[in-house]
Amino acid sequence: MTESERTESEAPAGWAAGPVREPRGRGRLFDAAVRAYLERHPEATVVALGEGLGTGFWRLDNGRLTWLTVVPPKTAAARRMLLPDGARRRTVARAVTDHAWLDAVPEPWRGVVVTAPGVLMRLPPPAVRALLVACAERFPGGVLVFDALPGRATALARRAAAAGGRWPAPRWGLDRAQLPRVACLHPGIVAVRELGPVPAVPGGAAAGGLWSRLVWRGRRVPVLRALTPLVCEVRFASATSPRAVPPGALRQR
């Protein structure tokens, strides 16, 4: 193993084992979706939007992928200091809404999986639509995985934020009944589905603990279903698919 390969595969120096442990709850759904995509496209690029100081690369690296972390410039400076770029991972200093980050994906034809945990709900609806359309046009055969709050939960979260709550108010929400509308945003979007249940923890332990199990089971109860968050995967048409549309085609109509 070369020095660069050793550095890539090992956890960041000075970090305890904790930061690279398996995530809980919804985080497992994101990891499972990435792993499933990498099984089909082992040399794909993983684009982690808003990852901050996350260490997903060390959890999911298969030795062949490329990893891009897209964060605002100030966050990017801190990440590069603590987690310097490597041969197959790089921090891109861009806001999610600055679509110049799409140009940083080196070889999209090898496959692209974009993850956006906690990201889309912080964007205004037009920015969410623009991001989905841009990815559909630029990443044929790729997928985007995101989470969202249903409309009722979004309204409650906004009230809590207005009352001085800890978390910022979400700007965009998505009900489960609205998933087909996402597929209609662009001809290059071929499927939108909710992911779940939360995958089991290796070794047979319950995934995500008691709270995650209760949340998942609560989806079967209509009242609770309207409040529980959802994790979704958007699939984009391959370049050879009859539904694939050249970049900018919709804007030219």
Where are these regions (language model features)?
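Alpha-helical subdomain
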Residues: 1-45, 51-253
